[in-house]
Amino acid sequence: MLLSSPPVDKRGPQPICMTTMLSPADTPVPADTSILSARYRATTIGMVALVALHAFEALAVAAAMPTVAEALDGLRLYALAFGGTLATSVIGMTLAGRWADHHGPARPLWYGLACFVLGLLLAGFAIRMGMLVAGRLLQGLGAGAISVSLYVMVGRSYPEHHRPKVFAAFSAGWVVPSMIGPALSGLIVQHLGWRWVFLAVPLLAVPAALLLRPALARMQSTAVGDRDDGRGNVVRWASGASLAALLLYFGGQQQGLPALLCIGAAMLALLFCVHRLLPTGTLLLRRGLPSVIALRGIAAAAFFACEAYLPLLLQRERGLSPSWAGAVLSLGALGWFAGSWLQGHQQRGWSRQQLLRVGTAMMTVGIVATLAVLFNPVPLPVALVGWALTGFGMGMIYASLSVLTLSLSAPHEQGANTSALQLSEALSVTTALAVSGALFALFVETAPHTGYVLCLAITCGLAVLATVIARRV
């Protein structure tokens, strides 16, 4: 059988045209593909700087507070100086979310920054402990508003494919302060005085915020007409939730029956309030956004409750020095950044749901491995690897939930939903720490090993629950 030859092109030789299939990695991309391109550079640097300053302030104040309380003769208000900040941040988060949805993120950001800076100045110039506590309450109000406003800015300023990288940068903004913040705070207290722990932050926060002015000016209000945003009701429920959070914090400092009564009453009040503040179905773990909001709270509670007791466990039960116990926590911070970076740069095309399932599984395995060192036959390196793995999983979870919240929200809902995301975290962590703290205080004198086991069982249970919720997102 003869093969016919191809027809001859009478036009003569033609230039050869080769078509190549480009992989996604080889596909040309716009010039502003980086979050540090000219279009986004000032916004990115300004937001990350504010995140880093907030992180440094939180960590540095925690390290300096014993000196502050002694200098102002205010040990009896020591707990309120910490818990009050969290309580007022609940109000700041909630109000900023509603405000940003109706008028854009500029107003809540500027008002939040004003409260934050004024609170720092009030605390820095405090002549008595009551004045310092007032400053801390104002700080919390401002910090809550700033955090929600920044999330809304991410949703309004960056296209969806940039958002994972922005949230990875936010994680980086926490890593450096977590590594050097406490030590730097100690040096400031020792050589400059404790007041500069508060007074130094405004000097940097205001210039960082000014970098955001061009981006904020481009954002328009998403309000439709003059609709009522129900701000009065929001204030009432947010105030109730903040008081319940404060009562939880107070209950966690008590022992025996008073602790149980405080925590029980606070949890009932908290459930009643958050039912009105969180998206419908959050407490029932409905699929979609409600499960995203719930997962943020459960995963954060598991991680931070474990982190609270890990240094104590390593020092008292395994004989590590404070510096080595702190080094273990630093591994978790580095793991968190690595996991957050991976979710923003992974090339396998994993969906956010897949990242959440892998992240929650890694966090659960890491927590179990970390807490296994409660038993002496388990070698200490297991805790090092376990806590790094826990941080890695949490980095994947945390940033992915932030991205999902924005993608599942209409522009006029981003403020309310991001405030619900952070509200879920704050209140869940407070509840977990209060309950575990009360249990630990109950057994620490008579059966400390039992106290550790009960507290760590709570963190493991929360981690397992997080893996279940991740399949409902």
Regions found by a protein language model. Name each.
Residues 90, 97-228:
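Helix-loop-helix hairpins in multi-pass membrane proteins, especially solute transporters
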Residues 190-296, 307:
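Hydrophobic transmembrane-helix bundles of small-molecule transporters
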Residues 69, 73, 126, 142, ...:
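Short helix-loop-helix connector
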Residues 2, 10-11, 15-56:
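Cytosolic juxtamembrane N-terminal segment immediately preceding the first transmembrane helix
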Residues 64-90:
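Extracellular/periplasmic helix-loop-helix junction of adjacent transmembrane segments
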Residues 58, 62-66, 118-124, 175-190, ...:
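Membrane-embedded alpha-helical segments in integral membrane proteins
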Residues 40-63, 82-84, 92-95, 106, ...:
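12-transmembrane solute porter fold
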